[in-house]
Amino acid sequence: MYSQVEHPAGGYKKLFETVEELSSPVTAHVTGRIPTWLRGSLLRCGPGLFEVGAEPFYHLFDGQALLHKFDFKEGHVTYHRRFVRTDAYVRAMTEKRIVITEFGTYAYPDPCKNIFSRFFSYFKGVEVTDNALVNVYPVGEDYYACTETNFITKINPDTLETIKQVDLCKYVSVNGATAHPHVENDGTVYNIGNCFGKNFSLAYNIIRIPPLQADKEDPMNKSEVVVQFPCSDRFKPSYVHSFGLTPNYIVFVETPVKINLLKFLSSWSLWGANYMDCFESNETMGVWLHVAEKKKGRLLNIKYRTSAFNLFHHINTFEDNGFLIVDLCTWKGFEFVYNYLYLANLRANWDEVKKQAEKAPQPEARRYVLPLRIDKADTGKNLVTLPYTTATATLRSDETVWLEPEVIFSGPRHAFEFPQINYKKYGGKPYTYTYGLGLNHFVPDRLCKLNVKTKETWVWQEPDSYPSEPIFVSHPDALEEDDGVVLSIVISPGSGPKPAYLLILNAKDMSEVARAEVEVNIPVTFHGLFKRA
């Protein structure tokens, strides 16, 4: 999958430039042929405003949320985008400065306030951002843009207008929730967030939002906690970006990247800090994996352990003959990868980008296998009996199960990230294919298809072109897992008057089917979905 492609021209810097929203959709110029069955909207979130006046944002996850939409209808494509009217955005525009602290940018107090009003404002509590720049997902008939705090933002998926802010704390006991919920085919939504558990210790709650019922009541009102995972460190919860779900089990991976809660509360309130200032790494804990029975809400009393890694994205999780297979996009070691995602690093010249990436944790896609039943008589033995994997699970004398992975992709400073699968049919089930964004020293420069069984890869790549997360859209009459197309927004700043386009690939061989070009730059986007018409 990887090749030594260089980017000396630095076209990737266009990914991190401020753009204006559009007053109305623009028509894209199509080359190739859009499949007639492809009808609906590609919705994506990302940062679109990287400074407010003279005040810059510093981290990749700080820019103000911009919602994008490509509409497909009868072979034609239009593009639209609007800023999400979050409190963070509206107040910044009103006061012409950064008002709410973001992931890596501290919001300084209003200089017009006197010292006493600024002092007392510190004790009103932490003002959490609602900057919904990470993902968009459905709940019932509604759609929400989200980040990773307790605030999500209801949006209109047709007009991209902002409807209202929603505080998850008013419905369930969580301090925040991930931007990667699982949405089942019946509309049930599962997510995870940290919370205060027993004896004021931190814990992690799995929340369930039911599908829309006949009474048409907002499903958010029926949200509930279905299981609680304990925290390995009383006051330092791990950073959680995603989790695994199968028909019968929930998998939570607790990594050594920790949030120092005391530092979060004291530093933030008293002398000013941002979210990044409150992360630290536990260099000795490694990784703990927790499993719960989904329907009974009961924790499995098995202690799974492995060596340290960062984790942001689960590829897929499934059950097979008494085992859970957990496929992950990992980054080796305990150092936090986000330390390398400051905009100054990402906007640097190519040689400096490579230099910084050489210091960062090494990416690797891995398969872990977790036995669901253990026998003390098997101490010292590998418990994995599945014939198709080299992953091992060894029962130790302290009754922990030590896991060693099977590597399904690894390349020097080349990551297989932002993974997508045929989720509707194969999410939580045995599968063969995953699609990912290829990161070359953190620069996205290819789209990849990976056969997780054979490790065969297919790649789309063009010079000085920078794609986004691939979104798989299944053919409505699909007979095979990879019958469909892959959608990605590509930035190609050196290609003339049309610097960006929506790329459509054949999901079987990653060959180009069509592209829809627009005459505006499109900054980096993180995640999204395809909403069928």
Curated annotation (Swiss-Prot):
Protein name according to UniProt: Retinoid isomerohydrolase
Cross-referenced InterPro entries: Carotenoid_Oase
Listed GO CC annotations: endoplasmic reticulum membrane; membrane; plasma membrane
Subcellular location, record wording: Cytoplasm; Cell membrane; Microsome membrane
Modified residues (Phosphoserine): 117
GO BP, one annotated term: retinoid metabolic process
UniProt binding sites for Fe cation: 180, 241, 313, 527
Family per record: Belongs to the carotenoid oxygenase family.
E.C. numbers: 3.1.1.64, 5.3.3.22
Requisite cofactors: Fe(2+)
Lipid linkage positions (S-palmitoyl cysteine): 112, 231, 329
Catalyzed reaction equations: an all-trans-retinyl ester + H2O = 11-cis-retinol + a fatty acid + H(+); lutein = (3R,3'S)-zeaxanthin; all-trans-retinyl hexadecanoate + H2O = 11-cis-retinol + hexadecanoate + H(+)
Post-translational modification: Palmitoylation by LRAT regulates ligand binding specificity; the palmitoylated form (membrane form) specifically binds all-trans-retinyl-palmitate, while the soluble unpalmitoylated form binds all-trans-retinol (vitamin A).
Primary location: cytoplasm
Pfam families registered for this protein in UniProt: RPE65
Organism domain of life: Eukaryota
Sample GO molecular function, one term: all-trans-retinyl-ester hydrolase, 11-cis retinol forming activity
Keywords from the UniProt entry: Cell membrane, Cytoplasm, Endoplasmic reticulum, Hydrolase, Iron, Isomerase, Lipid metabolism, Lipoprotein, Membrane, Metal-binding, Microsome, Palmitate, Phosphoprotein, Sensory transduction, Vision
Expression sites by tissue: Retinal pigment epithelium specific.
Coiled-coil intervals, chain numbering: none
Cofactor note: Binds 1 Fe(2+) ion per subunit.
Reported function: Critical isomerohydrolase in the retinoid cycle involved in regeneration of 11-cis-retinal, the chromophore of rod and cone opsins. Catalyzes the cleavage and isomerization of all-trans-retinyl fatty acid esters to 11-cis-retinol which is further oxidized by 11-cis retinol dehydrogenase to 11-cis-retinal for use as visual chromophore. Essential for the production of 11-cis retinal for both rod and cone photoreceptors. Also capable of catalyzing the isomerization of lutein to meso-zeaxanthin an eye-specific carotenoid.
Membrane-topology annotation of the record: Lipid-anchor
Disulfide bonds: none
Gene source species: Gallus gallus
